[in-house]
């Protein structure tokens, strides 16, 4: 199934639910950046979380940036997600791999906190005009889900549950995605409802398996996870929104960035290398500028 995002309400409209499937976007990010299993999972989770946060923005041009700055071997992470369903991202050390840890039940997991180390999660909301607004929280578990929930609680004072997950079989990514459940502003004082949501979330185990079961029918994920909350799909034009890995870079933008180096440095590049190669961090696309193009750019100063 193609990547998509769906919205619903629950508990008579008092709880907002959003789910996103990012399997194909994850595969595209992995291909472009030559990601390891560990970094594929971490970037996938961050892209999914970014799309969930962006889905609540009021303007269609709104975008959310998730950035991890820390002292661990991951060497940082950066995701840019839009209300329009586009997402892109990269990690500082794409080849990083850590040994899997085996539980007493025979399951395996990565130590995400070992990958991130100590540091901060920055979330920036940009509505396309005025100054973007950034909030910062300390990294907790490093697995993205709990860190985003911490951000929502401490920076936006929103009681939320965030689930992220993926399924890997025979070295292939079968599915990836995330879900968020939030108490709506009209019910934030309803302690009974808050406790009910908390209890329902505690019952959820193996989110990734639920995601796998719903990957061909994403709306069914809500009823699988919250049968007691009577979830109802929101029927609007942009529900069941298409999601894709899409970068906003272009050759023109790359040329504009090159001009920022200044005339003298561009002359030095032309004399020494006869060309310039620009690589987009977000999508790894390479833009080559030849000697004649460099001369033209220099002539514009």
Swiss-Prot record:
Keyword hit for Cytoplasm: yes
Protein name: 33 kDa chaperonin
Entries under Pfam families matching the protein: HSP33 (PF01430)
SUPFAM superfamilies: Hsp33 domain (SSF64397), HSP33 redox switch-like (SSF118352)
Primary localisation category: cytoplasm
Keyword Cytoplasm carried by entry: yes
Xref: NCBIfam families: PRK00114.1 (NF001033)
Lineage: Bacteria, Bacillati, Cyanobacteriota, Cyanophyceae, Synechococcales
Assigned keywords, A-Z: Chaperone, Cytoplasm, Disulfide bond, Redox-active center, Zinc
Record gene name: hslO
Coiled-coil boundaries: none
Family note: Belongs to the HSP33 family.
Organism annotation: Prochlorococcus marinus (strain SARG / CCMP1375 / SS120)
Location within or outside the cell: Cytoplasm
Disulphide connectivity of cysteines: 247-249, 280-283
